[in-house]
Amino acid sequence: MKVRIALPRRLARALGRLYGALHATLRLEGLLPDGSRVTPSTYPFGREIFAFCERDAFALGGILGRARFTTLIAPGRDGDWATEVVTSLGGRVLRGATRRGGTRALAQLLRDLPGDDGPLALVVDGPLGPSGVAKGGAVVCAARTGRPLRPVGAAGRRAPVVGRSWSRLWLPLPFSRVVVVVGEPLPVPPALDRPGRERLAGELTRRLAEARRRALAEVDA
């Protein structure tokens, strides 16, 4: 039994190293709200919350690996592998999702974040979709921490979709150009009722779609 557990972990760590090597070949370009352009090495990472869709996770993981980031990963076998990969990139992982323990994981996240100066990266449409539709967890986190909540979208030229996942997860090709659009922070008040949370989740969904459209237009230009 120990061998069966250890082997996948070694493979996942190796995958993390390959993942980092892939990102080293990419031509990564960040597009900010004011139209200015940055590279991952010049982006001023801080105490912000990056909200993105699962489809962009492969494209963004290596970029976030340049910062000391924290993320939330759903339970399950896929989550186990993802945890090993994120850890190999230098990220900190808490396990949980919007279902089955997500409330507890979010509470732990909120307890741990005050002394953490690194960014928080949250997949907002998981664990089961629909793709591109934000849940309310990131909004709650922004309300309780006061951190800026930034919608992020990415696109790559001729990028293949991995498997048949609900999320349409895509993988950047080696040496390809990848554009990452970082949107304006979504204003989130510290006190939110359920209708307010749902309204802001809807606005976040709209902004994520806009970031995705901008990234696609830029990469195809």
Where are these regions (language model features)?
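Generic beta-sheet signal
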Residues: 96, 123, 151-154
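Alpha-helical membrane-targeting segments
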Residues: 1-27, 81-84, 88, 103, ...
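A cross-family acyltransferase "interaction/gating" segment
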Residues: 135-193
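Catalytic-site beta-strand/loop segments enriched in glycine and acidic/polar residues
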Residues: 108-141, 145
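Catalytic core of membrane glycerolipid acyltransferases/transacylases, capturing the structured
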Residues: 46-101, 145, 162
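Membrane-anchoring hydrophobic helices of lipid-metabolizing enzymes
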Residues: 1-66, 110-111, 205-221
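C-terminal functional extensions of proteins
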Residues: 185, 192-194, 198-216
